[in-house]
């Protein structure tokens, strides 16, 4: 029987088998021997021990499409990054940091600016324009007024989505609205998942529709690009791609070099200055990390 791990805790994996519900499974010793750790999001094969009690053994981890390090998760289709338009004001450097991390892992990102009811249309248009011009999908929502929820639901359908964003942006409100239509068979599932005194510091997938899962990411603000060379950073800015190879110097990193096509595009307003300034700041940060390494 196949399913997806939606939570792992204290040696148990909770596996969602679409038609049959959630099974509490123990990972067999062979995984420890092979040093293969089951992750939330893993598609797995289980053997059922007790159908009534919904218990079983994990017998195989199916091949992974991808694997995130922080949070530890597998088979992520996309990321939904949520910031508020106001209260708190968006931290664009933090947003760009997250986008780079996802670009590095080839996971497409959708940007959601929540609390749109707190800003004027002109300001919303500016925010929208910055990231649309880089090729990202951008949503403007209001959890308070339940605006844009059906649009998010459509984008999430049939996918496993990592949800990220700093605190206070309305992440929980949006997640609750998305879960509203799913009864969650509340009693049994939540009883099974809440066994033991554990908080949600553990990665967990929330079911928001058939084969549709959301994963919250704790520790968002401490995020940074791990294991990246400074020369690699430019490849994680989609808006730089069309200028690659058009600079005077081969291997131009678009920081101090003369006759740089990217810097020229910034001057001409084709690349947003704020995005470029964040790029330079990250480049210098990686340069410092490199110095400390050697």
Sequence positions of predicted segments:
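Canonical P-loop GTPase G-domain recognition
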Residues: 117-169
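Helix-rich effector regions associated with P-loop NTPase G domains
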Residues: 11, 29, 35-52, 62-78, ...
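SH3/SH3-like beta-barrel fold
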Residues: 13-17, 25, 46
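Structural detector for short beta-strands of small beta-barrel domains
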Residues: 1-9
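Phosphate-binding glycine-rich loops and their immediate beta-loop-alpha structural context
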Residues: 86-135
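Short, Lys/Arg- and Gly-enriched loop/turn segments at beta-strand edges
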Residues: 51-61, 89-91
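Short, structured beta-strand/loop micro-motifs enriched in basic residues and often containing a Trp
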Residues: 21-30
